Design a protein with these regions (language model features):
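N-terminal secretory/membrane targeting signals
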Residues: 1-25
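Interfacial loop/helix-cap signal at membrane boundaries in integral membrane proteins
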Residues: 25-41
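Predominantly long cytosolic amphipathic alpha-helical stalk/bundle segments
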Residues: 27, 71-186, 212-250
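Hydrophobic alpha-helical transmembrane segments
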Residues: 36-65
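Residue-level signal for the membrane-embedded core of alpha-helical transmembrane segments
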Residues: 48-51, 55-58, 159-162, 166-169, ...
Length: 250
């Protein structure tokens, strides 16, 4: 009895091993997938796949670089809040900020506008002239912070269609090959058509992070620009008060 049970167990184990080996062999010998799509694809299919890869790399590059830039701006905002307003005057406060700080750039442009209110510019109301100088500087900062966001918007809106084009082109080529071979069995149709559908999945995989990254960065830009606008408004008030007391550049 025990020997019979042992024999049945050994036979079952052998069948499991053989089944696992067969499944492993099928996985290894799978003729479909990304590698087959690249190996069997024509110039158009390969170019489409490369475009999607480039779009993905570009969008991730923009996301990480803009994220680092926004973190720097928020750090500069904390420095300006703690150092700038404790200075003796606007010039000393600007000199105490980092060289590449947008807040230093705005302060210097505000000082430049206040000091160049002469000649024809002197006919402009001083309050309006200082306001314009600071506003131009803030617009410059905002423009720099928005650089690259158009790339994410473009990738997010076009990548699905690029992937869809690759799918349509792949299905067309698959149907042509099937028609030329004269065989329309499921094993002949499923593989090429499935490979073509991968293009749509890749297009969506490229577009979704770009759209999410765009919305996230736009929101963070809004928060950063609130700090910039608050600084500009306070600087405008300080420059007007300094001009009235004659201490703007002392």
């Amino acid at each position: 009895m025990i020997q019979h049970t042992f024999t049945r167990t050994a036979a079952s184990f052998s069948m499991l091993v053989l089944s696992a080996s067969a499944m492993a062999e099928e996985v290894v010998d799978n003729p479909y997938g990304l590698s087959a799509l690249w190996a069997q694809g024509d110039v158009v299919a390969k170019a489409t796949l490369l475009i999607l890869v480039i779009m993905s790399m570009g969008s991730w590059y923009v996301i990480f670089t803009k994220l680092l830039e926004q973190n720097r701006v928020m750090r500069y905002a904390q420095t300006a809040q703690s150092n700038f307003w404790n200075a003796g005057n606007v010039r000393q406060g600007a000199d105490g900020l980092e060289e590449d700080s947008p807040f230093r750039f705005i302060a210097e442009k505000g000082l430049e506008g206040a000091s160049k209110h002469t000649g024809l510019l002197g006919s402009i109301n001083f309050n309006d002239w200082v306001t314009m100088s600071i506003q131009r500087a803030m617009n410059n900062v905002q423009s720099r912070m928005q650089d690259g966001l158009a790339v994410l918007a473009t990738v997010g809106s076009t990548a699905p269609f690029v992937g869809l084009f690759g799918t349509v082109w792949g299905i067309y080529n698959a149907l042509v090959k099937i028609g030329m071979s004269g065989q329309a069995s499921i094993d002949k149709v499923a593989g090429p058509v499935g490979e073509s559908l991968i293009m749509t999945a890749i297009g969506l995989a490229v577009a979704v992070p770009a759209v999410l990254g765009y919305n996230w960065l736009v929101r963070r830009n809004k928060v950063a620009m609130e700090e910039v606008h608050a600084f500009g408004a306070d600087l405008h008030a300080v420059l007007l008060g300094s001009a009235e007391s004659g201490a703007a550049n002392k």
